[in-house]
Amino acid sequence: MLETRCKYYKNEAMFHGFIPHIMGTRFDILLIHSDIDRLNTLWADIAYELERLDKILNRFDPHSEVSKMNNHASQSKIQISKELKSILQLCSYYYQTTSHLFDITLKDFSRIQLHEHSYISFTSPDISLDFGGFAKGYALKKIRKFIEQENISDAFANFGNSSILGIGHHPYGDCWKVSFLNPYNQSLLKEFDLQDTALSTSGNTLQYTGHIMNPLTGIFNEQRKASSILSPDPLEAEVLSTVWMIANEQEQKKISEKFNNIQATLYNL
């Protein structure tokens, strides 16, 4: 059962929901509204949705849908859920629009074969799917819809300080302020003022280096660099923050022309 916690701060009309372990990280959300019952219901819906998505996309869970697909799709056609089919179609779109730098197979997305009636197969036995650079952005997009449906105008959702959505503003400010720190020395790289905007960051750290691979070359990026993407779309921000770590200047320019609402920055650490 998913572990969740929550607390309501009456003076600020602020609800804090917390999940210590989901999608490989922690999740926090702040919801600003005076109706505590409404916020409790919304929080329950969000927590349920995150658990549901994790059961689809978490490749480390042997019972998840993606794990079952990874184990069998290279052997024969298997049927997948309509949502996973839709997700794969989204991934195909980002594969094409990022010059093949976004690739959930880390090898060759074209080896995924989608068939009629939501069946899928892999044309190579060594293909498996990893939604690590997709799932949190996809989840934030879903969460935003829940918040909008409840007509809540101020909220802040945060996956592990790397995938963030700011809606409206903080109770004591005109935006949601987020500091992006250098992971090697904790100095300030940039401060963002989020207002109806998503932020995604990516990069190497002292403890976590060489985890980002260029699918076109098979080479892991071990440079002391980090990236940040601002976008109205949380999923675009998530996808492109990883892409920016491996794209060269020419590729970045080409991709920027297709995503003209983003603000992308690459940092030397």
Feature annotation, model-predicted:
Residues 1-269:
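Mature catalytic core of soluble alpha/beta enzymes
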